[in-house]
Amino acid sequence: MLDQLELQSGFARRWLLDSSLMTADEDITRCYDVLHRFFDFVEKVDKTRLDTLLFKLQGLKDIRTTIKNLHNHATLDDIELFEVKHLAILATDVARLLHEHEMDRVVEIPALDEVISILDPDGMKIATFYIYDSYCAQLKELRARMRQHPEQQDDLMLEAGELEEGVRKDLSLQLHPFATAVEQAQIALACIDVNLAKAMQMR
């Protein structure tokens, strides 16, 4: 039966397989209540909105290693910072879609607006990561000098690299308090993916 579930993300499948078997009556009841709400949702929602939600869930990736590093006060690299930003934007988009149909309290997704603000200083809401000039005035000035004086590239690039690493360290420190919320958001999205797949299988 699990193999027949049309899950949108590989992480949701791993999360489902790793989940402990429920034995407490209240947990089982809660699980069926959630599934019932998702069944009603897929029956009533228009196909375009459902397809949009399913498509977004395809973007859910397994970033548990990154989250572990964030918990452990590690300085995240550019790829890890991208993963956190991507998840935060994805979680916010999915939460908004569910809120439109009063489904946001069925599976609650932690608010990650502050995470987005930290990683998206220019407010572009694009799920890519780059050490923007907005992070550091000194870095902005240095990059301008690099464009104006290409003959000094080697020395200036070394200095820029040191400044960029400082930005990564600062961003990681700012993000650390949100490590648990990011982790919970990843799990919530997997739960939504699983329940949607089960609900569609029941149709």
Question: Residue spans of the language-model regions?
Answer:
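Conserved P-loop NTPase architecture
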Residues: 65, 89-96, 116-203
